[in-house]
């Protein structure tokens, strides 16, 4: 089955109306949630980062609403990050100055799962070969 990975900044932008990428983030998350885009994996590290950020910036209610919406969505699939991805991510982190540790773990998971497409507004991923970053609600498998 075709799958993509979604970065924290997409989910955060969709939930915070003041975010500069709010409209694009909302369009992407709604298309995923409605099944117009492939299943989107959300790694547990990413989920924690999103919920913690939203709680700090938007309040507890928006954090809880987001958590529940992601869990209940048929378009998003929450994935526990295995230790092997964290270990591989540490190696990726050492190689790419443009990536945070969480971003590097995303890369490691994508490499392990052989997933090419990532919805993200972070251009730091552009330096990683084998990953195609998407910033609009387009289905990469229907090109």
Briefly describe each language-model feature range.
Residues 10-11, 49-50, 88:
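A general alpha-helix detector
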Residues 52-79:
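Helix-adjacent hinge/juxtasegments
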Residues 3, 114-143:
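Acidic, PIN/NYN-like endoribonuclease modules and their adjacent C-terminal/linker elements
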Residues 3-6, 28-57, 80:
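PIN/NYN-family metal-dependent endoribonuclease catalytic core
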Residues 78-116:
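Active-site neighborhoods of divalent-metal-dependent phosphate/nucleic-acid chemistry enzymes
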Residues 13-17, 55, 59, 94, ...:
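Amphipathic alpha-helical interaction elements
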Residues 1-20:
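Metal-dependent nucleic-acid phosphoesterase active-site entry motif
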Residues 36-40, 75-77, 114-116:
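Short active-site oxyanion
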């Amino acid at each position: 089955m075709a799958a993509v990975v979604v970065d924290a900044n997409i989910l955060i932008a969709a939930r915070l109306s003041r975010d500069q990428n709010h409209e694009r983030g909302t369009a992407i998350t709604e298309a995923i949630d409605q099944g117009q885009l492939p299943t989107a994996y959300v790694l547990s590290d990413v989920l924690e980062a999103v919920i913690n950020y939203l709680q700090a910036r938007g309040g507890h209610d928006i954090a809880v609403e987001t958590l529940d919406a992601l869990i209940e969505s048929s378009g998003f699939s929450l994935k526990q990050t295995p230790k092997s991805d964290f270990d591989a991510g540490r190696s990726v982190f050492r190689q790419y100055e443009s990536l945070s540790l969480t971003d590097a773990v995303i890369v490691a998971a994508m490499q392990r799962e052989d997933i090419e497409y990532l919805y993200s507004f972070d251009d730091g991923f552009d330096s990683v070969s084998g990953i195609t970053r998407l910033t609009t609600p387009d289905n990469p498998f229907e090109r």
